Swiss-Prot record:
Protein name (Swiss-Prot/TrEMBL): Ribonuclease HII
Alphabetical list of NCBIfam families matching this protein: PRK00015.1-3
Function, in words: Endonuclease that specifically degrades the RNA of RNA-DNA hybrids.
Gene Ontology terms for molecular function: manganese ion binding; RNA binding; RNA-DNA hybrid ribonuclease activity
Cellular component terms (Gene Ontology): cytoplasm; ribonuclease H2 complex
Keyword Manganese: yes
Lineage, broadest ranks: Bacteria, Bacillati, Chloroflexota, Chloroflexia, Chloroflexales
Family that this chain belongs to: Belongs to the RNase HII family.
Keyword check for Nuclease: yes
Domain RNase H type-2: 17-211
Cofactor details (free text): Manganese or magnesium. Binds 1 divalent metal ion per monomer in the absence of substrate. May bind a second metal ion after substrate binding.
Length: 212
């Protein structure tokens, strides 16, 4: 089933007009930032949801489809905000606090007022706005699904750029996720400055290099 506006309509009936869907990309990666996006859909999308036809959980879409829909979201959203937390802060704070920080950054980057939040799976402490945390929210809420695509495309572009700076790791291919290619590169070259040194595969690569 594709995400829809059922949850958004329910919140609007309760008096919350501008709703921000929030999601992240890159939480489980071995390298690179965690990126979050916040998306407020426009009244036009609520009247005509097929303006964002094809929006789904970003993991279910091809890279080409994500790029196309990314453009549609930017065109039809009332506001889009992005937050980026780099690997060294992930190591300093831990991945969950870093994810929340990226989400708060994305919320603060929105160019429009927000009445309530619909978030994929987590709550944001210290934020006074009403929050609805949905497990697998990117499969249920169109706002969250749109945010997941913005976050994923933004992060993929960053990792493609990082591939030019650190060409030995294959970042353009795997985007920092754990793959056999990535593991072999870690074993051969050791971690780059973009690697999360508190993540177990990176720790193992460091220990192996120290012992060799």
């Amino acid at each position: 089933m594709l995400p829809d506006l059922s949850i958004e309509h329910d919140l609007q009936r309760r008096g919350y007009a501008n709703l921000a869907g929030i999601d992240e990309a890159g939480r489980g990666c071995w390298a690179g930032p965690v990126v979050a996006a916040a998306v407020v859909l426009s009244p036009a999308v609520y009247r005509q949801p097929d303006l964002l036809a094809g929006v789904n959980d970003s993991k279910q879409l091809t890279a080409g489809a994500r790029e196309r829909i990314y453009t549609s979201i930017q065109t039809h959203a009332l506001g889009v905000g992005v937050g980026i937390v780099p690997a060294f802060l992930i190591d300093a704070y831990g991945i969950l606090p870093a994810t929340r920080l990226a989400m708060i950054q994305a919320l603060l980057a929105l160019p429009c007022a927000v009445d309530a939040l619909i978030i994929d799976a987590v709550q944001l402490p210290g934020i006074s706005l009403p929050q609805t945390a949905l497990v697998r929210g990117d499969e249920r809420s169109l706002s969250i699904a749109a945010a997941s695509i913005i976050a994923k495309v933004t992060r993929d572009r960053l990792m493609a750029t990082a591939d030019h700076c650190f060409p030995h790791y294959g970042f353009a291919l795997h985007k920092g996720y754990g793959t056999a290619v990535h593991r072999r590169a870690l074993a051969q070259y050791g971690p780059s400055p973009l690697h999360r040194r508190t993540f177990q595969p990176v720790i193992e690569a460091l220990l192996s290099l120290e012992q060799s």
